[in-house]
């Protein structure tokens, strides 16, 4: 009876010792510093702990059967019964996740952005779940308007949607401003919209029908250019009275050029400020129904500028009736009077120029008179030109010599005498007076004889003078 119990105790004791050893080893492994998991642990490292997991260990225990002494059994191998003993212990499993961001960063607490898969049967439910927010109506001011509700998908639902679903558009959008665009039909039969757009374009632009033959190259939208042959044909086709009733020919050159030779029936006017007096009265009404033709020496500066000045006055008077103009059709003689004169001279036509001569603007005989005008300059000032013309008109007769003398005084050296100032009193009144410059000598030395520039006036008188060098060659007594 005692032997089986001892055997059972001997068997159970090593099993219990084995179990305790296994428990101690497992605890040492989990708390050991050599463990790879615990090496990554740190105080500031964010850790995601999973739920506690349980592990079961099965141990087989052999238990002996108790046999009574009274039972007559044959000796043989002892039959043993196996018993399963289950030990349960809790083991904490830790998972360490390292992040690049700082532990205090706001991204640590953000919702995970991993791609999520959605079942096809749940996609319909996601589409039904929608939230509403406010959106402004489309208008020019899209910041302060009454809100309107627009359905939009949730942010989480957008992530879970597959590629087969429709693309979500933002609720807020800038207003679309419709831009007017001119479209023209490329077919042989344009549409009605094309004609309406062309009529709308004609209302904002002045369309002029020129009846004379013009130069092919269009130089300006305000006027057109005609050749010398075209103007010559007009004189041959119309009489002098018919020409005056239909056209007005304006010579924009200076008076000395006009007097030496100009086209017949032409009037001289070079001031662009007073061009309105020719075509309009004091009340701003149109004087005549004539077609203006402008020209100058080359028709490059003075003639075209006069045409632009007339168009500017016309626009100012008809500002409420834009784009209507009183003088819509205007012409400029191409290449000017110079080309017209030589073309008529080659054709032996002498009755088109009165007198039949030509004077250049830079003629040497009229150099001083050219200084009165500067309308041919690109940077000319109208106010300065008007003031200069008035000052020259106020000069008395016989003051041409005084003007020449005063102009020569600007180029010559300043004079110290006051005789020229007294003789030019009349000229000084008509122009800006020039301050006379009188040269004065600087007395840098108390004694003028000490000045290095006055050696000729005050020769030096010294008792001891430096001996002059010998003019004969030097001789050495050794070689003499």
Swiss-Prot record:
GO cellular component: cytoplasm; nucleus
Keywords: Cell cycle, Cell division, Hydrolase, Mitosis, Protein phosphatase
Biased composition (Polar residues): 1-20
InterPro entries attached to this UniProt entry: MPI_Phosphatase, Rhodanese-like_dom, Rhodanese-like_dom_sf
EC number: 3.1.3.48
Superkingdom classification of source: Eukaryota
Effect of loss of the gene: Viable, but 85% of animals are sterile at 20 degrees Celsius. Reduced number of intestinal cells in 1.5-fold stage embryos due to defective intestinal divisions and binuleations at the 16E cell stage of embryonic development. Knockout with wee-1.3 RNAi suppresses the defect in intestinal cell divisions in the cdc-25.2 single mutant. RNAi-mediated knockdown causes abnormal male tail morphology; this phenotype is suppressed by simultaneous RNAi-mediated knockdown of wee-1.3.
Keyword Cell cycle: yes
Similarity comment: family membership: Belongs to the MPI phosphatase family.
Protein name as it appears in the record: M-phase inducer phosphatase cdc-25.2
Lineage, opening ranks: Eukaryota, Metazoa, Ecdysozoa, Nematoda, Chromadorea
Name of the gene this protein is made from: cdc-25.2
